[in-house]
């Protein structure tokens, strides 16, 4: 089993078996980040209430296709992001929260522009590798209806990426390997459904 498969299995197992006990009203939320969808990356998050002010969760995003096949423009990746939230007001899934994240991603990008000048060389080359990061966010949740919420969140992550670099976006020989420490802004507009 590859590393990413092991990590994903562990996270899903923790979420499933961690909730085997008594499930209370409004103890599970499912969410989707609309900004992540805008990058053509389907994503899904699940949060479980573990205390009156704490939730544990995970987000998975997966982009397995090319942006433009003729140019071989791609931003393929798998992202797994376990998180913990501390709700600051009237209980979970209400008003403001602080969130801590662990982030893992396997990526294969080429002939594209990555925001914030993280990898300027990607326009002329292809990078394939992995990254780990730690992040922190502040967010706010608005109640739309009994089961529906909208969240807005912003934060920052610091991480480390290691990758193989290839000659051109579509093909080419391996040029070498590299690594990089990075700082990345985190933004989200989440549509949330609370399961009773």
Regions found by a protein language model. Give the residues of each.
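Solvent-exposed loop/turn segments connecting transmembrane beta-strands
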Residues: 30-45, 63, 69-75, 92
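Membrane-embedded beta-strand positions of outer-membrane beta-barrel proteins
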Residues: 30-32, 46, 58-60, 82, ...
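Transmembrane beta-strands of outer-membrane beta-barrel pores
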Residues: 34-38, 60-66, 86, 102-108, ...
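Outer-membrane beta-barrel "beta-signal"
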Residues: 84, 181-196
């Amino acid at each position: 089993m590859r590393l990413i498969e092991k990590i994903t299995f562990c996270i899903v197992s923790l979420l499933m078996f961690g909730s085997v006990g008594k499930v209370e009203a409004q103890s599970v939320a499912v969410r989707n980040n609309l900004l992540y969808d805008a990058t053509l990356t389907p994503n899904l998050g699940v949060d479980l209430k573990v205390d009156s002010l704490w939730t544990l969760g995970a987000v998975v995003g997966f982009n397995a296709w090319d942006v433009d096949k003729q140019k071989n423009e791609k931003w393929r990746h798998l992202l797994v992001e376990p998180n913990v939230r501390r709700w600051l007001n009237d209980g979970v899934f209400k008003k403001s929260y602080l969130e801590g994240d662990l982030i893992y991603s396997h990526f294969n990008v080429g002939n594209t522009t990555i925001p914030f000048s993280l990898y300027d060389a990607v326009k002329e080359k292809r990078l394939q590798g992995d990254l780990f990061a730690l992040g922190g966010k502040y967010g706010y949740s608005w109640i739309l209806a009994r089961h529906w919420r909208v969240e807005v969140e912003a934060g920052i992550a610091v991480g480390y990426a290691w990758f193989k670099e290839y000659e051109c976006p579509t093909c080419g020989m391996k040029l070498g390997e590299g690594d990089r420490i990075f700082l990345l802004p985190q933004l989200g507009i989440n549509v949330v459904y609370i399961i009773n």
